[in-house]
Structures are given as C-alpha cells and as structure tokens.
C-alpha cells in the first residue's frame, strides 16, 4: 500500500476536518519548489527513500505510521503557511527586476497578478483532484488519470523543474562567489587570476561541498535550511529597497582605487558616454575627474542637475532614468516564464496538505492564499525597487547588477554571503528527490546501493555544472524551465488531472469549462513563450561575455 494513498479521501467534506488527534513532531521541512519535488519521495519505497523520509522530514515518526490511509495531520496552520511560502520562494526572485525592465511597470504588475491568481486557481484544481482521485502524490494522480504515460509526464515535469532549480542555484554561485572573493581581496574586475573565475568556483564548490552533502542518506538539516533561505530572501528585499535610495541615476562608474562609490560635492565630475547593451543609445555615466580625464572632453559639459548625493550629471534627450510602463521587445518573452518559475510550488502542495492539522480543502486553500499573497508582495517589492535602481541597466540576476557600483559594501556582502550559503545547502536538497525518482523508475525494488547512490548524484551534479558553464546567463534557465516544466506544473497537469479524475461534474459544468479554459491558456502560454524564446535565441544569440 502506498503510504500516502488515501482511499477514502473522496468522501472528505470540504469544510470539515479529516484529521484526527495531533501527534508530536510536526512536518516542518518542506523546501523550495525549486528545492524538492516531495511527491517522488513519498512515492518511493526503497531503503533510501524510507531513510530520507523518516530521518530527514518526519523526525521520530516511523514510515509505518503512514500506513493508515487516513492518518492525522500534525502541522499547524501557521507552520503550513510558512512551509508553503518557503516552497514558493526561490531563486526566481532574482530575475524579476529583469522581467520588469522588459515589460514595463504596469504590464509587469498585470502579469504578476495574473500568474499569482492563476497559481491559486491551479492549487484549487489540484486539491479537488486529489480529493476525487484519492491520492496525495503528483505522479500517482498522473498514473490514475492516464496510466504510465501520465506518471512519466508528471515525473519529467517535476524533474525538469528541479534540474532547472539546481542550475539556477549554481548560476548564483557562479555570479556571486567571485564578487565576494573580489570584495575580500580587493581585486578589480579582470585580474586574470583563476580563483575569481566563476566556472572554476562552481566546480570546486560542487566537489568540496555539494557532492559530499548529496551522499548523505538523509537531509535532516532541511528544516533549518528552509527557514534560513526564506529569512535571507526577506533580508535581500530589504537591502534592495534600501539601496534604491543610495544609488543615483545615471549610474556612476565604479572607482576601483576607492573600492566603493563615494560622492563628494567638492570634486569635479566628468560625464562620459558608455554603451548600454539594453538600449539603442548611450547612457550617461559619471567619472571622477581626479582619477580619469577623458581626452577632448570639455569640463563645462559636466554641468547638470545635482542629485541629493552630490553627483552631477548631464541631462540626455533620452533620459534613461525615467521608468517605462509598457515595454515590448524580444526579451519580453522571458517575463511569463520567469514569473511562472517564481510561483511553482505545486509538487509541495499535496505533502503540506497531508500534514495540515485538522485539514480540509478550504483550510489548505486559505494557507495557499496567504502564502501566495505574501510572496506576491515580496516579489513586487524586489522587482520594483530593483528596476527603479538600475532601469535599463538591470541584470538578469539582480544581485550581480550591484557589482557595477560597489566592490565592497557591508549590507550587500552580507546578502551575498547569506544567499550563497542558502543556495549551496539547497542544491543537495533539490538533488535528493531527483535521485529518488530516477531510482524508483530505473531500479524499482532494488536494495540500496552506495555505488548507485554516488553515481546518480555525481552524474546529476556533473551535468548541471556543464550546463551552467556553457549557458552564459541565468535568464535562459529561468526562461526555458519556466516556459516548459513550470507551465506544465501550474497550468496543464492540474487542469488535465481535474478534467479526467473529477467524475461527478459534467463536462459542460462551469467548473469543467473553467478547467478547460485554464488548460488552453496554459498551452498557449507554453507554446507562445517557447516560440518567442527560440526566436530570441536565433536572432539575438547569447553574448558569452555578458557574464
């Protein structure tokens, strides 16, 4: 009997509890949706899976305790909201300012609200399907709906999402660890040394930290890492808001001899023109005259308006410091996939639901409403203030953009270190369910093998390292995974499972019609986004020197 199977779940009342008395040791360890596809862990019954579940997630509980198909939930409403918020929050927040820069503020807000509302509706469909289908496992719902192909489809979508998550975390290490090393060692951008090279660093971190952690048979630190990840993202948003009011526009050129931007009203400032990759015309940047004196530049041309920081700049006819409200270009195609990537939490909804104390669909829907709304606010703040800091110069990974104006800044350094620790500890958590699912599909009912355990982890880490080294920018990971697996998990799979498994409603009922429309919208999003992204790859090939 599958430990998470609920034979009688379809008679559970919507507004009443289906759980019994509470038992100790709440389920507090669900990670990021980009961290773990929990369904594959619960579905597996091999020794590794059982060890992972009983030691890594369920504390002192035995797996046998879940043999009761109607086992009681133990996790409070508040902790469930925290767990789901943590499942939603991930590396996708770092790409939202880039999405706003390529859609405009108003269009981005409309799209953000739309994806959030559609995610809530998707959770509603998923919860109802789980009730009617009698299972709290994503792959099992696929199997009940379409047999083996449905199970494989769910497995591939969840695995792709987790591989994309692993790659995005390794990209963050590739981007941010060199900046931390440069800050501590006082190095300039291009010194020719090997140790600030992000490609080397991700290999060293993978071999020295990620692979050893991935060889553990259980990950008991998951709950602590999850809480730390969410805390560091809150800190990240706070620093983004704070830095908006410190960094002037146009962006001054970083003076490496000083190490930070320091503005002095008594110093003469020269305006120089530097190319702006994201716009057709140039952007006005500032240079300190005491360090650089561009030939042929008239000192009188440096006069202009005075910012509160004391930085003078020359007004330009095409002012780059004005926010754009509606933007459409080739990079706009990445907006919806980035947003979809940021809101994926659906593989974790059902495990969190199964552990909710006094659970009901209505209560779990409220948990989802609170969690998604909270993350919506954080996403909007991070995107808006990040965009209003850099405008058209924003990077596809927001933290990396601050390297343009700082080499050593304590708040940013703290954020970078916190994010680096969080993502480094999270990569093994993402790898665990992928390995468990691969083991379940390829080596069913085989005894645990350390050799297989090691080889699967090593191959997955090696493939992700190659991917991160070869792909020049994180936006392609956000874009491709968001347009494919994230769209499948948010739109397509919940809708088709609902249409297939919920039998008591006629196909012409408003609920089924709504699910059908939702499915069509998801297919359009998926095909449209993938087509536009591929066109962008063809006509605007990646610039390898971008990072």
From Swiss-Prot:
Molecular function GO labels: alanine:sodium symporter activity; L-arginine transmembrane transporter activity; neutral L-amino acid:sodium symporter activity
Q: Which residues carry this modification: Phosphoserine?
A: 49
Which Pfam families has this protein been placed in?
A: Aa_trans
- Which regions of this chain are Cytoplasmic-facing, per the record's topological domains? 126-151, 217-220, 354-369, 433-453, 498-514
Q: Where is this site: Influences on amino acid transport capacity?
A: 232
Q: Does the keyword tRNA processing apply?
A: no
Q: Which GO terms describe its biological process?
A: L-alanine import across plasma membrane; L-alanine transmembrane transport; L-arginine transmembrane transport; neutral amino acid transport
- GO CC terms for this protein? microvillus membrane
The entry's localization annotation reads: Cell membrane; Cell projection, Microvillus membrane
Major location, coarse class?
Answer: membrane
- Glycosylated positions are 260, 264, 276
Q: What topology does the record note for this protein and the membrane?
A: Multi-pass membrane protein
Q: Which UniProt keywords apply?
A: Amino-acid transport, Cell membrane, Cell projection, Disulfide bond, Glycoprotein, Ion transport, Membrane, Phosphoprotein, Sodium, Sodium transport, Symport, Transmembrane, Transmembrane helix, Transport
Residues of the region (Disordered) are 1-26
How is it modified post-translationally? The disulfide bond plays an important role in substrate transport, but has no effect on trafficking to the cell surface.
This protein is called Sodium-coupled neutral amino acid transporter 4
What reactions does this protein catalyze? L-methionine(in) + Na(+)(in) = L-methionine(out) + Na(+)(out); L-asparagine(in) + Na(+)(in) = L-asparagine(out) + Na(+)(out); L-threonine(in) + Na(+)(in) = L-threonine(out) + Na(+)(out); L-serine(in) + Na(+)(in) = L-serine(out) + Na(+)(out)
């Amino acid at each position: 009997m599958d430990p998470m199977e609920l034979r009688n779940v379809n008679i559970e009342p919507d507004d009443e509890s289906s759980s019994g008395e509470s038992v100790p040791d709440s389920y507090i360890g669900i990670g990021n949706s980009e961290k773990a596809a929990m369904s594959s862990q619960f579905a597996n019954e091999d020794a590794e899976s059982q060890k992972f579940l009983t030691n890594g997630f369920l504390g002192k509980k035995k797996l046998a305790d879940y043999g009761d198909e109607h086992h009681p939930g133990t996790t409070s409403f508040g902790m469930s909201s925290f767990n789901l918020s943590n499942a939603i929050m991930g590396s996708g927040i770092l790409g939202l300012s880039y999405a706003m820069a390529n859609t405009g503020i108003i269009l981005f807000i409309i799209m953000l609200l739309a994806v959030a509302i559609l995610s809530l509706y998707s959770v509603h469909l998923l919860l109802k399907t789980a009730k009617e289908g009698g299972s709290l496992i994503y792959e099992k719902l696929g199997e009940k709906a379409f047999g083996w192909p449905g199970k494989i489809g769910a497995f591939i979508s969840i695995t792709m999402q987790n591989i994309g998550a692993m790659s995005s975390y390794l990209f963050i290490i590739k981007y941010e660890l060199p900046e931390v090393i440069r800050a501590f060692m006082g190095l300039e951008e291009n010194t020719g040394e090997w140790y600030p090279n992000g490609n080397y660093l991700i290999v060293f971190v993978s071999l020295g930290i990620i692979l050893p952690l991935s060889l553990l048979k259980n990950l008991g630190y998951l709950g602590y890492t999850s809480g730390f990840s969410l805390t560091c993202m809150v800190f990240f948003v706070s620093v983004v808001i704070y830095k908006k009011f410190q960094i002037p526009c146009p962006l001054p050129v970083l003076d490496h001899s000083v190490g930070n931007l320091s503005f002095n009203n008594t110093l003469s400032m020269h305006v120089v023109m530097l190319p702006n990759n994201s716009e057709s015309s140039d952007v006005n940047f500032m240079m300190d005259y005491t360090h650089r004196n561009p030939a042929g530049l008239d000192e009188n041309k440096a006069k202009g308006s005075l910012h509160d920081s004391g930085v003078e700049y020359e007004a330009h006819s095409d002012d780059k410091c004005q926010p754009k409200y509606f933007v459409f270009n080739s990079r706009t195609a990445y907006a919806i996939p980035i947003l979809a990537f940021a809101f994926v939490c659906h593989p974790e909804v059902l495990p969190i639901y199964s552990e909710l104390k006094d659970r009901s669909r209505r209560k779990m829907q409220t948990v989802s409403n609170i969690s998604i709304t909270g993350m919506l606010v954080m996403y909007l703040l991070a995107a808006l203030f990040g965009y209003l800091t850099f405008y058209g110069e924003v990077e596809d990974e927001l933290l990396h953009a601050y390297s343009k104006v700082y080499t050593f800044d304590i708040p940013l350094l703290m954020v970078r270190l916190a994010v680096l620790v969080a993502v480094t500890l999270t990569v093994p958590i993402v790898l665990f369910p992928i390995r468990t699912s691969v083991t379940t599909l390829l080596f069913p009912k085989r005894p645990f093998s350390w050799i297989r355990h090691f080889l699967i982890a090593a191959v997955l880490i090696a493939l992700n390292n190659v991917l991160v080294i070869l792909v020049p920018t994180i936006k392609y990971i956000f874009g491709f995974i968001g347009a494919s697996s994230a769209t499948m998990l948010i739109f397509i799979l919940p809708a088709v499972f609902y249409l297939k498994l919920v039998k008591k409603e006629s196909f012409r009922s408003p609920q089924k019609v709504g699910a059908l429309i939702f499915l069509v919208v998801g297919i359009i999003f998926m095909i449209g986004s993938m087509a536009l992204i591929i066109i962008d790859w063809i006509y605007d090939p990646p610039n390898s020197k971008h990072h």
